[in-house]
Amino acid sequence: MQSFLQLVAHDLYAKIGNDLSRTVLVFPNKRANLFFNEHLAGESDQPIWSPAAMSISDLFRKLSVQKAGDPIRLVCELYKVFREETESQETLDDFYFWGELLISDFDDVDKNLVDADKLFSNLQDLKNLMDDYEFLDKEQEEAIQQFFQNFSIERRTVLKEKFISLWDKLGTIYHRYRENLAELGIAYEGMLYRNVIEQLDTTRLKYDKYIFVGFNVLNKVETKFFQLLQDADKAMFYWDYDLFYTKQIVKHEAGEFINRNLKLFPNELPESCFDTLRKPKNIRYISASTENAQARFLPEWVQSTLSTANEEKENAVVLCNCLLYTSPSPRDTR
């Protein structure tokens, strides 16, 4: 059975040919490209102009006029804005954890293309609702406190108190922080992604085709990015899934995401390539009473089962902690 990356290499070569110099492959991470190049090389006995390849995060960074900021510097810059807006005397040490949390929230806001003004306005309304129960009878108050139990007055920790007290400042902090970072030419990842989408000129892109391979759940900024390239006729999509999730099970969670992706961005590969789960499997169970027993069995299994380097590359071992120290050499280091 051909692997997903083999199918992609074969299909891409059939459609574009030997010269892939104006093509870039975009993967969720960097590892997949190592295997893809081997499969692509096997498609022809002639020299091939290999495509460029990068992760989605690398692609956004290349398209951005800003640089990804160092995590420590990002927190320090946020701390400056925080001090100015709140007049807080909190030290940087005390603020650091809270700063990382807030940057993570801002990152989610931008990656999901949320209207920040509306979001933080709604958060302030929620705070007011939770802080003032005078218009509710006792039963209604208890019901609301149960629903928002993580934020209820009785359960508030010091960290939550600090967070809630700043809700009315979050919108201002968010905008000022982004403005300051823009002046410095740096950004946190979500800000960088969002700026790319808002400023993207598809007529000035470096490559003729952007090949997106093996993605799954997309955030809104990725979806918008895919749509912009699709509209410019610069995108091709290869989705890895199985018909078991999209056809056999009604409303399976994984199937919902896959079907949405397939509807928005049709797959270059036919459905017939993705009907594997229903085929017979050869599954062997090994009884091991403890994790140490599993660890002792692994070297024996690797040496008796995987006889060639190619077999090693086509198999994976999911490691628990004790297994990390018992994998046989030299195969575990290649």
Predicted features and spans:
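A short, hydrophobic C-terminal helix/tail in secreted or cell-surface proteins
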Residues: 328-334
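Nucleic acid-machinery interaction/catalytic patches
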Residues: 1-327
